UniProtKB/Swiss-Prot annotation:
GO molecular function: magnesium ion binding; phosphopyruvate hydratase activity; protein homodimerization activity
Catalytic residues as annotated in Swiss-Prot or TrEMBL: E218 (proton donor), K356 (proton acceptor)
Name recorded for this polypeptide: Enolase
Residues annotated as binding substrate: H166, E175, E304, D331, S383, H384, R385, S386, K407
Length: 446
């Protein structure tokens, strides 16, 4: 029996920052399947287009009624009657035929909006799992051609100190994460992370006052820290005090495009101070040296977006210098785009992909980006966005793709913990068929 799509309805809901986003209900004979898409704060210029209304009289221009209209009036009529198990066919129809917009890096989704296409793509995945009588993670594994007998549970990279565009402090680097690689299971890794998080909260309260323990968009703290060393010292102290020295490592997301000056090709580490004295302006080469020094001094295992999204040269220099011991992750550099990944492979620019489904705009293309990266022995980290919803799709996706690592915020705020809690459920349901990535989070666990 064919399980066809009988109805699609899109609506505008609020994300975790109070901004509108797209949610879709997709109906088949087996029920109603729902999906909601996230949105980012520090977005790469090469990401697929997130369609906003730009009507300043409504939600300050951030409404998504255009995307909703595109779903209900353009996409839905074409998908009614299609088999919900034909994921690739449906995604290709939306991306290539109904939208059809392109730029130098591929399909740009600038006509219908990546937020419109992705919401349906995710809902179709959920609907497609139902007739197969399998969980979403097992169905996604099938779509990716991955084995689904033994599944890999990821190491959580928990964002506990915020800077950059995510925070009102002076800190230029955007995220400082704790990575519990020494835990025996996901459940224990989450416990290690939560305990370090609460220990860190006490340390921050003691040193910076109670106001400094307010949390940011992703649940992390944003005390008035001035530089990376200060943040890293805090983390090392918290890890040690919690009793997890050696078992919990550190990852950073620098988001360097946010403080890059393209005119003189420099990086301003004091970019949040207006009219500063330029004493913290660095060249790409100086920034390479800074990262090398930090890696020598602290237990850092991963650095994301260490340079601007077009600074291929310094990416390659850093990867050559420390890539054997440290994961160099491309986010704004790659934007989950297979064409950008191919260029990075040619230039040896980095050795890991940050996988964000809404950067590329369809599940088929996201899987393609992951498989291309894994084929070339890169690490892959599945990621949330700073504007999230209660949708837990990425928790199933990370298990399905066997990437061994996920970042979806601090162990705080329900839209973040929703993903971690779903991973707890998946690990429990798999029983002995669950393998925790642990120290091997960068390796191919295929």
């Amino acid at each position: 029996m064919a399980h066809v799509i009988t109805r699609i309805n899109a609506r505008e809901i609020l994300d975790s920052r109070g901004n509108p986003t797209v949610e879709v209900d997709l109906e088949t004979n087996l029920g109603i399947f729902r999906a909601a898409v996230p949105s980012g704060a520090s977005t790469g210029i090469y990401e697929a287009l997130e369609l906003r209304d730009n009507d300043k009289s409504r939600y300050l221009g951030k409404g998504v009624q255009k995307a909703i209209k595109n779903i209900n009036e353009i996409i839905a009529p074409k998908l009614i009657g299609m088999n919900c198990t034909e994921q690739k066919k449906i995604d290709n129809l939306m991306v290539e035929e109904l939208d059809g917009s392109k730029n130098e890096w591929g399909w740009s989704k600038s006509k219908l909006g990546a937020n419109a296409i992705l919401a349906i793509s995710m809902a179709v995945c959920r609907a497609g799992a139902a007739p197969n009588k399998v969980s979403l993670y097992k169905y996604l594994a099938q779509l990716a051609g991955k084995k689904s007998d033994q599944m890999v549970l990821p190491v959580p990279c928990l964002n506990v100190i915020n800077g950059g565009s995510h925070a009102g402090n002076k800190l230029s680097f955007q995220e400082f994460m704790i990575v519990p690689v020494g835990a025996p299971s996901f459940k224990e890794a989450l416990r290690y992370g939560a305990e370090v998080y609460h220990t860190l909260k006490s340390e921050i309260k003691k040193k910076y006052g109670i106001d400094a323990t307010n949390v940011g968009d992703e649940g992390g703290f944003a005390p008035n820290i001035l530089n990376a060393n200060e943040a890293l010292d805090l983390l090392v102290t918290a890890i040690k005090s919690a009793g997890y020295e050696g078992k919990v490592k550190i990852a950073m997301d620098v988001a360097a495009s946010e403080f890059y000056n393209s005119e003189n090709k420099t990086y301003d580490l004091d970019f949040k101070t207006p009219n500063n004295d330029k004493s913290l302006v660095k060249t790409g080469a100086q920034l390479v040296d800074l990262y090398i020094d930090l890696v020598k001094k602290y237990p850092i295992v991963s650095i994301e977006d260490p340079f601007d999204q077009d600074d291929w040269e310094n990416y390659a220099k850093l990867t050559a210098a420390i890539g054997k011991d440290v994961q160099i992750v491309g986010d704004d550099l790659l934007v989950t785009n297979p064409t950008r990944i191919t260029k990075a492979l040619e230039k040896n620019a980095c050795n890991a992909l940050l996988l964000k489904v809404n950067q590329i705009g369809s599940i088929t293309e996201a899987i393609e980006a992951c498989l291309l990266s894994q084929k070339n022995n890169w690490g892959v980290m599945v990621s949330h966005r700073s504007g999230e919803t209660e949708d837990v799709f990425i928790a199933d996706l990370v298990v399905a793709l066997r990437t061994g690592q996920i970042k979806t915020g601090a162990p705080c705020r329900s839209e973040r913990n929703a993903k971690y809690n779903q991973l707890l459920r998946i690990e429990e349901s798999l029983g002995n068929n669950a393998v925790f990535a642990g120290e091997k989070f960068r390796l191919q666990l295929n």
